């Protein structure tokens, strides 16, 4: 246990460590715009089995990221302009971002009744 004099002498040594960002490509922003240059499927890690839809996106700050496309069905192609947000997919290594549905070139999920705001679906009449 240090004495009070030792603490006063070394003020800087007892600072909390700086936390590394989990979403460095967003650069502190809630969302970022980017252009798709590859849309493809990936298989998840071990106990799960599926073909998860992902897109490789070049952001407006020049960083290239892989983002998941949530929901059933999508209309993304090469050169589509999309908006991405943070949020990883637990069974896809390296996928730390999600595409925002219903914004820019990506349409919302069709016939979605619950959790519509997450999937960009307008209210049905």
From Swiss-Prot:
Ranges for region Disordered: 1-26
Provide the protein's localization: Mitochondrion
Subcellular location, principal: mitochondrion
Q: Tell me any Pfam family this protein matches.
A: Ribosom_S12_S23
**Keyword Transport (UniProt):** no
Q: Which domain of life is it from?
A: Eukaryota
Q: Which GO terms describe its molecular function?
A: structural constituent of ribosome
Q: Which UniProt keywords apply?
A: Mitochondrion, Ribonucleoprotein, Ribosomal protein
Q: What is this protein called?
A: Small ribosomal subunit protein uS12m
Keyword Ribosomal protein applies: yes
Q: Which organism is it from?
A: Prototheca wickerhamii
What GO biological process term is on the record, naming one? Answer: translation
Regions of biased composition (Basic residues) lie at 8-23
């Amino acid at each position: 246990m240090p004495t009070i004099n030792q603490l006063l002498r070394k003020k800087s040594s007892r600072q909390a460590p700086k936390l590394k960002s989990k979403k460095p490509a967003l650069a502190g922003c809630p969302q970022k715009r980017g252009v798709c240059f590859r849309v493809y499927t990936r298989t998840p890690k071990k106990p799960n089995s599926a073909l998860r839809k992902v897109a490789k996106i070049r952001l407006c700050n020049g960083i290239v990221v892989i983002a998941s496309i949530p929901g059933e069905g999508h209309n993304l192609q090469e050169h589509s302009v999309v908006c991405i947000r943070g949020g990883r997919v637990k069974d896809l290594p390296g996928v730390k971002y999600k595409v925002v549905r219903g914004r820019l070139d990506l349409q919302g999920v069709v016939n979605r009744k619950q959790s519509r705001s997450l999937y960009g679906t307008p209210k049905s009449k």
